[in-house]
């Protein structure tokens, strides 16, 4: 039996496309050619799929909230070292869960898992070269001392020669970088640089000191540190800080597997569908690290809700909770007086189509048996026998 024949048999079935393809591949792999057996397998798969589909009118939102919220009460409140990488501090537990559903623009501990391609992933020295190209190098990171010299009225930088060599930089590279960022007169004396300004004063020199320290020399901005770790048969880089777009441009990086824990950044670089997958993955990993198991479909429900408008929105008064169509539903969530006052001024009408607003006014909700209308047959009304 060919793939085209199987696709024709399955094209009008209730099975989703991914399941159809997987089923077709499995039938071909097992080399099942008898048509009656293939038909029986398809029918059994459809029956099994139908049993897993949720009943119409089921309160899936409440079930998802309970299923995520209840294990959430058992999660740790602390931030501690990530089990896999002892050198990196990563937010885990409840604080991380809150970060995800709040769609924070910047996580408290941004980090990246950078996978390598080709020969880079099997050779530690090659992986170290990539890590050096990624790790952000500033003037401070290649200096032994940066201070204000009151006697000579200048900023003195004592460069660390070993650090410069290990990062493949020269004193001239540092001088050029400083000149491109600041208007200063620079005097060189081997590894000591004296930075002078036109009108020197203690206040002016101290004001420039932090800027001099942060001047970028090499690598990807925002990536403070990169560590190399052996994962089964390949080397993987873990970074402190995140910059997905620029890391993708580094030679040797596998762009198909590299990821970050910054969901908003994933949306900006790879789009909303990738952000949805990241929300599911991050929530699942956060719960999994605590030894908690939640059905993925509950997490998918939350991710779908957060990304349904094409951008990642938080679950709260500044996102989904504050954008509900119903005035009463918005008022019931947070900022009650503000919503009621605003609605009465503008003359809004609530059509009571949701759950919360119907509960407020004491009407049956449109869920479960409440979403079914009972009709009387015409024959029964006319007194005819049924």
From Swiss-Prot:
Enzymatic reactions: RNA(n) + a ribonucleoside 5'-triphosphate = RNA(n+1) + diphosphate
Keywords, alphabetical: Cytoplasm, DNA-binding, DNA-directed RNA polymerase, Nucleotidyltransferase, Transcription, Transferase
Annotated transmembrane regions: none
HAMAP family the record matches: RNApol_arch_Rpo1C
EC number: 2.7.7.6
InterPro entries: DNA-dir_RpoC_beta_prime, RNA_pol_Rpb1_5, RPO1C
Self-association and partners: Part of the RNA polymerase complex.
Organism per entry: Methanococcus vannielii (strain ATCC 35089 / DSM 1224 / JCM 13029 / OCM 148 / SB)
Full protein name: DNA-directed RNA polymerase subunit Rpo1C
Cell compartment(s), UniProt: Cytoplasm
Keyword Secreted: no
Annotated function: DNA-dependent RNA polymerase (RNAP) catalyzes the transcription of DNA into RNA using the four ribonucleoside triphosphates as substrates. Forms part of the jaw domain.
